[in-house]
């Protein structure tokens, strides 16, 4: 477990060197809060949920048929295999998803998106070691893509490895500053590590970026509400 001070850092003096290989949780919070801005996200009325769900299922069936036809016509096109595998993933058919995604990695061993999607499937199956291996390969092939580092952070959090989670998530935040998902996951690491105040700051920032972020809002409610609104 990482022990952290809950004292607010002097954000004007904190700067994380690019050559650092690991970061403290306090530094992670400071970096995010320095660049935090608030924007208003668009939402959907609750009554539309069931309509959109039905529409989505119909669209996925059409998408599946489309990419199956493309793969049948040109079985050695890696991109089509990835699209087909990802569609199976969205439908919850992980066996077929992995089959086509792994074929894509064999067709093109340098195709980062293929490895990323393999990682997504393994993550859903809670095969975390295999997922980390896939995301790590994707990150090496596409080092500027924040998504691979974010997913590694998600898995490290699930495993209780908060130190490695913070390192991976800080890298994700470097590549895409201001991602509500990344900020939320660093908040998870903070909360699980015992830094409740830091977690509240991070969850508050995530909700400021995305007011419809349910998990972050639930986390804030659990910790006593948004940071700065205690009184």
Region roles according to the model:
Residues 2-73:
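Long, contiguous interaction/recruitment modules in multidomain scaffold/adaptor proteins
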Residues 56-69, 91-103, 113, 124-137, ...:
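Structural signature of tandem alpha-helical TPR/SEL1-like repeats
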Residues 73, 107, 141-142, 175-176, ...:
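Structural marker of alpha-solenoid helical repeat scaffolds
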């Amino acid at each position: 477990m990482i022990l952290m001070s809950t004292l607010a850092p002097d954000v004007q003096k904190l700067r994380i060197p690019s050559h650092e290989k690991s970061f403290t949780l306090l530094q992670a919070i400071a970096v995010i809060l320095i660049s935090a801005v608030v924007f208003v996200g668009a939402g959907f009325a609750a009554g539309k949920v069931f309509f959109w769900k039905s529409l989505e299922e119909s669209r996925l069936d059409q998408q599946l048929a489309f990419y199956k036809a493309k793969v049948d016509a040109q079985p050695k096109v890696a991109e089509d295999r990835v699209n087909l595998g990802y569609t199976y993933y969205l439908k919850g058919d992980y066996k077929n998803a992995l089959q086509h995604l792994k074929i894509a990695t064999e067709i093109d061993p340098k195709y980062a998106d293929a490895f990323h999607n393999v990682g997504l499937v393994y993550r859903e199956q809670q095969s975390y070691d295999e997922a980390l291996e896939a995301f790590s390969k994707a990150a090496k092939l596409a080092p500027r893509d924040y998504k691979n580092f974010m997913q590694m952070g998600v898995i490290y959090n699930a495993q209780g490895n908060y130190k490695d989670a913070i390192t991976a998530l800080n890298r994700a935040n470097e590549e895409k500053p201001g991602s509500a998902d990344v900020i939320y996951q660093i908040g998870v690491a903070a909360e699980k590590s015992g830094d409740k105040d830091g977690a509240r700051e991070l969850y508050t920032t995530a909700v400021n970026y995305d007011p419809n972020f349910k998990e972050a809002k639930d986390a804030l409610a659990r910790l006593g509400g948004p940071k700065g609104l205690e009184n």
